[in-house]
Design a protein with these regions (language model features):
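Class I S-adenosyl-L-methionine
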Residues: 1-90, 95, 188
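Class I SAM-dependent methyltransferase SAM-binding "motif I" and its flanking Rossmann-like core
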Residues: 5, 63-136, 178-185
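Short secondary-structure boundary/capping segments
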Residues: 23, 48, 105-106, 131-132, ...
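Short, structurally constrained coil/turn elements
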Residues: 25, 80, 109, 160-162
């Protein structure tokens, strides 16, 4: 929050960023939604502003280390010799666990948490297919999967019991967060409703 309050330029990840996060921006700050920008435009704007002595805040959703697509941005800033700092955030994974009042690891249930996403526009190695990861029967936190929930459920049912408890959390930690609880057997229908 302190960086956002001082930043001259803020580039945020569109609808994924809670508007309350940006509410502390100083008057006169230049604010851009990166959803309408490509990577080259984003990194060029960041580098040019930083080189002009401006404080730049690149605001991602949750924690930038999980599906934040920051590797390319870091590489570009390094190549331009632009100093930067990565400030950790609260991942929607942990905000969801808090909203669910759930512990992700429980003795004799699961001591492992798998963080993944379904294959989509971003390719993914076959060895990381959800049905392959399901074989571990660990706690699974699946990002970006609600739009293909029936396919995700079908892959999970390869190894999980249909009565396995499941929750889908939308906009974790936001004022308008939504939680849908069910089992693997009925979650796809519950999400549709």
């Amino acid at each position: 929050a302190k960086v956002i309050e001082k930043a001259d330029l803020i580039i945020y990840a569109g609808s994924l960023v809670n508007p309350q996060v940006l509410s502390g921006a100083k008057e006169g700050a230049e604010i851009h939604n990166s959803a309408q920008m490509n990577l080259d435009e984003i990194v060029q704007m960041m580098a040019e502003s930083a080189q002009a002595g401006k404080l730049v805040a690149r605001v991602h959703t949750g924690d930038p280390a999980i599906y934040g697509a920051i590797a390319e941005q870091i590489q570009y800033l390094k190549s331009e010799k632009v100093p930067y700092e990565i400030i950790p955030g609260v991942s929607s994974l942990f905000a969801s666990a808090a909203a669910l009042e759930a512990e992700l690891t429980q003795p004799e249930v699961s001591q492992t948490v798998i963080i993944t996403r379904p294959a989509g526009r971003t390719p993914k190695p076959d060895r990381e297919a959800i049905f392959r990861l399901a074989e571990h029967r660990a706690t699974m936190c699946i990002f970006l999967g609600v739009h293909m929930i029936a396919k995700v459920v079908a892959e999970l049912l390869t190894f999980y019991d249909p009565e396995t408890p499941v929750a889908v959390v939308q906009k974790a930690s936001w004022d308008d967060q939504k939680i849908v609880r069910g089992t693997l057997e009925d979650i796809a229908d519950r999400v549709k409703d």
